[in-house]
């Protein structure tokens, strides 16, 4: 059976995992790292870089380097690169393609199916956008699961016989979630979830960037935030400082030649203490505490009921975050999981559940936000409460608001506000053909259906006429089937171009290597090579050099092959001249390996018994 991979598609970093021998295993990328930066960069020559190589050149190419695209999933945001517009789904698909390719290289087989995680507080359009990204990348997304839920699966897989209530605190690069779960007898039941999709490590970085920029402006009168290359250097320095302050109490930020004015170049050289960092980011840390309170209220549990607190996401390494959670909950934090990898591992476990590789595990997740429709007066009428276990189906009967009304518009909303206009519109559709009647008489049954991915379907039926209309929620920010198909084809084109470019690089590198090796060997051999042979090799070397920087790959391959064959021929001639007796036997004859002839094993050795003395020996048992 083909492998299904589990993917944590993160704001700043992504991770891919697979089940092997009943255990989730993180797949290293082509660069050897276990996580991949969610960064995409477009080069001047049309080349596309993804992951660590893209992040590495962000300073020199800030305008064409895209970071943290996950924050725009489910919106109409577009990225314009060289007059071509890309949606967040397309950029995310490029990251997914990289993860898919790395998984295929690791597994040695094609990968076509995946389980992808999303923040628990993602709304419907954000979930749809994630599925679309998977499709564009050539992946069938079998399940979308919430990140804290995935983390709990990874945490609890080897604790199937225990009964625990756990709180998962998930602070990633761009999003924040809290989920309360109950684990017992293989059932992972989410009781409540809360969060903030606009809060994460990026915001901690931004606080530092602003502080450094303001300090520099006060000293030099220059605002570095107006310089794209400078701001990219600040971002890199801020992230590095944040990471260092998780283990050290002070760090140095040193950015030479950050900018220049009439007086000459300007540099940044400043020390930053952990205390100052904590002061700058205090409000962000405090913002994470309210969702803990709300998720507890939603679950019906008190803090004293919680057995374990699982910290997930790279930003939970920040000491101030750990201290705040400890102080707020009054509990020690569990250190048993890797915060960067546990979500992807949980996704792989869910993939194992779907294939049957992981047995006796039941995952019961919840919808994070209230779902309803707009009714008379602009009121948002709830059909499905937040924290309802999914999949679920709920129906309610409504009526018309005016006499003789023959059609109704169903306005589907998601959110916690009492007025529909204050919530997020998921979609609208019209039910027509209602029999004319006084208001309040027609009976219109509205049904909400949420699948295991958290994707919403809504239908409306006139119970009098049997007329029915329905909609699978695809918000205006999501892509149509045609747009997805177009994006899929573009992604395949990119993949083919990347493959061709990689092949070109390998062929040219091979040509370079052979030219270098040939010239080095010629130098080493010196006058052992005749002038005629040397001229012949140099002619072939020149032929390779003439074509190796061009784009005719066949010509490069042919010239390289000609050089290789010529060099091998001349090398053989040199060795024959150096060892005329041994030249006839390439390697040794196994038939010579025996008795007194054991010493004659070298190639072409016809000499007999060159004073070889056989030694007698006997084996004595140990006493």
Swiss-Prot record:
Q: Where would one find coiled-coil regions in this protein?
A: none
Instruction: Enumerate the PROSITE patterns for this protein.
Output: HSP70_1, HSP70_2, HSP70_3
Q: Which residues carry this modification: Phosphothreonine?
A: 175
The UniProt keywords, alphabetically, are: ATP-binding, Chaperone, Nucleotide-binding, Phosphoprotein, Stress response
Query: What does the UniProt induction comment state?
Result: By stress conditions e.g. heat shock.
Q: From its record, what is one biological process in GO terms?
A: cellular response to acidic pH
Disordered: where is this region?
580-623
Q: Where is the composition biased (Low complexity)?
A: 591-604
Q: Where is the composition biased (Basic and acidic residues)?
A: 605-623
A GO molecular function term, named singly, is: ATP-dependent protein folding chaperone
The question of whether Nucleotidyltransferase is a record keyword is answered with no
Family the UniProt entry places it in = Belongs to the heat shock protein 70 family.
- Report the HAMAP family cross-referenced here: DnaK
User: Any idea what job this protein has?
Assistant: Acts as a chaperone.
Specify the protein name: Chaperone protein DnaK
Q: Please name the source species.
A: Clostridium botulinum (strain Hall / ATCC 3502 / NCTC 13319 / Type A)
């Amino acid at each position: 059976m083909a492998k299904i991979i589990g993917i944590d598609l993160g704001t700043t970093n992504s991770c891919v995992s697979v089940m092997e021998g009943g255990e989730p295993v993180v797949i290293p990328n082509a660069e050897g790292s276990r996580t991949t930066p969610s960064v995409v960069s477009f080069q001047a020559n049309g080349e596309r870089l993804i992951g660590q190589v893209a992040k590495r050149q962000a300073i020199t190419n800030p305008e064409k380097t895209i970071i943290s695209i996950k924050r725009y999933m489910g919106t109409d945001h577009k990225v314009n690169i060289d007059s071509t517009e890309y949606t967040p789904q397309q950029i995310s698909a490029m990251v997914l393609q990289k993860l898919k390719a790395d998984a295929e290289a690791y597994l040695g087989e094609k990968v076509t199916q995946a389980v992808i995680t999303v923040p628990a507080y993602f709304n419907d359009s954000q979930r749809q956008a994630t599925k679309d990204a998977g499709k564009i990348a050539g992946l069938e997304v079998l399940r979308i699961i919430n990140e804290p839920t995935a983390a709990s699966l990874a945490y609890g897989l080897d604790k199937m016989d225990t009964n625990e209530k756990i709180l998962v605190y998930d602070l990633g690069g761009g999003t924040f979630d809290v989920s309360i779960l109950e684990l017992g007898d293989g059932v992972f039941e989410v009781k409540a979830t809360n969060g903030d999709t606009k809060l994460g490590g990026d915001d901690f970085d931004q606080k530092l960037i602003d502080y450094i920029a303001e300090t520099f402006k006060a000293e030099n009168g220059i605002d570095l935030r107006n310089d794209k290359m400078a701001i990219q250097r600040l971002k890199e320095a801020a992230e590095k400082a944040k990471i260092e302050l998780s283990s050290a109490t002070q760090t140095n930020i040193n950015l030479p030649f950050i900018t220049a004015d009439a007086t000459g170049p300007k540099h940044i050289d400043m020390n930053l203490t952990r205390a100052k960092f904590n002061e700058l980011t205090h409000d962000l840390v405090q913002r994470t505490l309210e969702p803990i309170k709300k998720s507890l209220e939603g679950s019906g549990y008190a803090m004293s009921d919680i057995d374990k607190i699982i910290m997930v996401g790279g930003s939970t390494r920040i000491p101030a975050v750990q201290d705040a959670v400890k102080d707020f909950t009054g509990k020690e934090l569990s250190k048993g999981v890797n915060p960067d990898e546990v979500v992807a591992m949980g996704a792989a476990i869910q993939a194992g559940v779907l294939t049957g590789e992981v047995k006796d595990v039941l995952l019961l997740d919840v919808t994070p936000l209230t779902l309803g429709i707009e009714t008379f007066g602009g009121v948002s009428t709830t059909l499905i409460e937040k924290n309802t276990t999914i999949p679920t189906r709920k129906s309610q009967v409504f009526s018309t608001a005016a006499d003789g009304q023959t059609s109704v518009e169903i306005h589907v909303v998601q959110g916690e506000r009492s007025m529909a206009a204050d919530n997020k519109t998921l979609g609208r559709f019209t039910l027509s053909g209602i029999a004319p009647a006084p208001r309040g008489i027609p009976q219109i049954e509205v049904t909400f259906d949420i699948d295991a991915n958290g994707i919403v379907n809504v239908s409306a039926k006139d119970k009098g006429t049997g007329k029915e209309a329905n909609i699978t929620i695809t918000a205006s920010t999501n892509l149509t089937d045609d747009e997805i198909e177009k994006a899929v084809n573009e992604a395949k084109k990119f993949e083919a171009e990347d493959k061709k470019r990689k092949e070109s690089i390998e062929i040219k590198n091979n040509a370079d290597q052979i030219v270098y090796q040939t010239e080095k060997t010629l130098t080493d051999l010196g006058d052992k090579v005749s002038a005629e042979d040397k001229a012949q090799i140099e002619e072939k070397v020149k032929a390779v050099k003439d074509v190796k920087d061009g784009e005719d790959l066949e010509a490069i391959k042919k010239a390289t092959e000609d050089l290789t064959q010529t060099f091998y021929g001349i090398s053989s001639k040199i060795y024959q001249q150096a060892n005329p007796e041994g030249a006839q036997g390439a390697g040794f004859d196994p038939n010579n390996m025996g008795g007194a002839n054991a010493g004659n094993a070298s190639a072409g050795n016809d000499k007999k018994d060159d004073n070889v003395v056989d030694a007698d020996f006997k084996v004595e048992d140990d006493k």
